[in-house]
Amino acid sequence: MVNMEICAMDCCVFKGLLAERAHKCLILDCRSFFAFSSSSIIGSSNVRLSTIVKRRAKGSMGLEHIIPNEEQRGRLVAGMYEAVVLLDERTSELDMLRKDSTMMLAVNALSRDPRGSRIYFLKGGYETFSSQCPEFCNKNSPPVALSLPLSPNNVPGSADSNCTPCGTPLYDQGGPVEILPFLYLGSAYHASRKDMLEALGITALINVSANCPNHFEGHFQYKSIPVEDSHKADISSWFNEAIDFIDSIKTCGGRVFVHCQAGISRSATICLAYLMRTNRVKLDEAFEFVKQRRSIISPNFSFMGQLLQFESQVLAPSCSAEAGSPTISVLDRGTSTTTVFNFPVSIPVHSGANSLSYLQNPITTSPSC
């Protein structure tokens, strides 16, 4: 139940607020991660509430779920924001919202403890505001892959002079694709094209293979993840390490290119794990996001199972251990440890390939890429 009056804010009033006192305004976008990533209001933050979190919260959501950014949450608690503005796609009346909608849950959480900030919802949502005030919005259309000559013949820095455009595999055509402004995905061939990497501003590469060479170690920073594209491979044990590496390059203002042999299975899996962890989204949403940028991605069935298990960790609410929560042993590259998962249906993160056969996945995958 909302404990204080939530006022509607017209787009013209919101425009004036952004123009004059943007630093005193916290903008919370309650649309999906996919919609937010495609286009959003400059300076806004995305509110992402998983189905698991919604179900367990039973309508009582904590601020840590609504505002995961600690700095923003701290500023709100300290009363440093004059206004908190929430928006979704097109809502014009708050009464039109379902009680379990992301925006209504956010409104309820904020209204219980506003800390001196007035709470508003943007009338007409992003759809209306972006059409009336496009200058205050970022529009990030799915990027087109870099177009450079496919033949590496006579290209300075090329590591392979035996390929020709004739018969070039689909996964080697075009160039690396942008997943995020600092994260790119492609194949081993793309990783051998120094001209492509430099044109994109790549500063580091993650090589997700056991046999693809690191061609330019004196020029780029490399991280190797020696995983085979097989149903027995444990790629999930590398997720956190890969995510930390990407974040470290991002923090330094660099860009990371993730590749395997074809840029279809192993490297796509790492990119999916990164999106799921850092943006707190489900696998199917991350998969759709990446597939729109590189349509041929298809992690093998075992990798999809490991991503589903990773999803259960990423989206599980962080709370104290509860009775009935299973204690399970996981194998971390040969080291046996015990982990307690708080969500009752958690399953081993590093199960062998044989134990993944029961997992039902709606996304079509290929056996190997």
From Swiss-Prot:
Location of the Tyrosine-protein phosphatase domain: 175-316
Compartments where located: Nucleus
Class in the EC hierarchy, top level: hydrolase
CDD domains from the UniProt entry: DSP_DUSP1, DSP_MapKP
Modification comment: Phosphorylated by MAPK1/ERK2 at Thr-168 and at one or more serine residues in a progesterone-dependent manner. Phosphorylation reduces its rate of degradation but does not seem to affect phosphatase activity.
Superkingdom of the organism of origin: Eukaryota
EC number(s) stated in the UniProt entry for this protein: 3.1.3.16, 3.1.3.48
GO CC annotation terms, alphabetical: cytoplasm; nucleus
GO annotation, biological process: endoderm formation; meiotic cell cycle; negative regulation of MAPK cascade; negative regulation of meiotic cell cycle; negative regulation of p38MAPK cascade; peptidyl-serine dephosphorylation; peptidyl-threonine dephosphorylation; peptidyl-tyrosine dephosphorylation
GO MF terms, alphabetically ordered: MAP kinase tyrosine/serine/threonine phosphatase activity; phosphoprotein phosphatase activity; protein serine/threonine phosphatase activity; protein tyrosine phosphatase activity
Catalytic activity: O-phospho-L-seryl-[protein] + H2O = L-seryl-[protein] + phosphate; O-phospho-L-threonyl-[protein] + H2O = L-threonyl-[protein] + phosphate; O-phospho-L-tyrosyl-[protein] + H2O = L-tyrosyl-[protein] + phosphate
Modified residues (Phosphothreonine): T168
Keywords recorded for this protein, A-Z: Hydrolase, Meiosis, Nucleus, Phosphoprotein, Protein phosphatase
Domain Rhodanese per the UniProt entry, residue ranges: 21-138
Active site positions, chain numbering: C260 (phosphocysteine intermediate)
Family: Belongs to the protein-tyrosine phosphatase family. Non-receptor class dual specificity subfamily.
Function comment: Dual specificity phosphatase that dephosphorylates MAP kinase MAPK1/ERK2 on both 'Thr-188' and 'Tyr-190', regulating its activity during the meiotic cell cycle.
Protein name from the UniProt record: Dual specificity protein phosphatase 1-B
